[in-house]
């Protein structure tokens, strides 16, 4: 039996590298998309990406594709997300795509090309191919990792108050978390540390809030069995009698 590499039936499908780049902007989680000028899906919004070149690794390819849209150094984290191989995902012919998840911290405001913009993940425009579904997969990955890993470092500025960090987690998770519980959990896991400094006082005055930072900007699993869950809301009328 001949080798698959010498077989005339050896597949020769184009392989693409795509990137889902997320950032919390104005208290909402956004995805970076670009508007396609040509068919298929002219006028629809797509993820940054393109074909894998000969001799190029997937990691090198996604970095090259991203460089056309955003300064790669702005990313706080980049990891491989998933591979899509549905035969019908591209009307021009079969393609395989490997998607990456990238995160940009809030203190960075990258300059984007004219065809590229940030869109709230909970209100995406019409997307090309299966890119809307890939964004949803990236969102699920991020929410899962916020529960068991320290990936919040890639969304946060170098220093922050607990209230500011809570806003980032609420935007990314899609539901409310209390600042007190978030602080308690992350300190217990050894993820946060106080800087010893305080934030400038607000307009209302009061005691200045303490500043914190993530202990490391390297991804690590801090609690493999942990899961953040949305608060349980009791149905109306389900309470103790007065």
Task: Please give the residue ranges for each predicted region.
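Core subunits and conserved enzymes of cellular information-processing
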Residues: 1, 5-6, 24-26, 31-32, ...
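N-terminal strand-loop-strand
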Residues: 6-45
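Active-site segment of metal-dependent pyrophosphate-handling enzymes
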Residues: 13-20, 30, 59-63, 67-111, ...
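Active-site-proximal cofactor/substrate-binding loop regions of enzyme domains
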Residues: 39, 47-48, 55-58, 62
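NUDIX/MutT-family hydrolases
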Residues: 99-102, 110-146, 155-163, 168, ...
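Short helix-coil junctions and helix-kink-helix linkers
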Residues: 167-176
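Long, intrinsically disordered, low-complexity Ser/Thr/Pro-rich regulatory/activation regions
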Residues: 194-242
């Amino acid at each position: 039996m001949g080798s698959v590499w010498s077989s005339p039936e050896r597949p020769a499908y184009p392989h693409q590298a795509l990137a889902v780049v997320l950032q919390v902007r104005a208290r909402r989680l956004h995805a970076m998309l670009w508007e396609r000028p040509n068919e298929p899906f002219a006028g629809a919004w797509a993820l940054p990406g393109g074909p894998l070149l000969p001799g190029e690794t997937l990691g090198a390819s996604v970095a090259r594709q991203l460089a056309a849209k955003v300064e790669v150094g702005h990313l706080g984290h980049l990891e491989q997300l998933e591979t899509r191989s549905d035969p019908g995902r591209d009307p021009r012919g079969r393609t395989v795509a490997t998607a990456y998840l990238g995160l940009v911290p809030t203190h960075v405001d990258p300059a984007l090309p004219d065809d590229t913009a940030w869109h709230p993940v909970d209100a995406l425009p019409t997307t090309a191919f299966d890119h809307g579904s890939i964004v949803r997969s990236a969102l699920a990955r991020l929410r899962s990792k916020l529960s068991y890993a320290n990936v919040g470092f890639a969304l946060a500025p170098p220093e922050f108050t607990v209230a500011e960090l809570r806003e980032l987690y609420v935007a990314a998770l899609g539901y409310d978390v209390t600042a007190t519980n978030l602080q308690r959990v992350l300190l217990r896991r050894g993820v946060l540390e106080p800087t010893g400094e305080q934030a400038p006082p607000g307009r209302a005055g009061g005691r200045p809030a303490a500043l914190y930072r993530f202990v490391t900007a390297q991804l690590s699993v801090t609690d493999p069995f942990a899961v953040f869950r949305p608060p349980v809301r009791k149905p109306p009328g389900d309470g103790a009698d007065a």
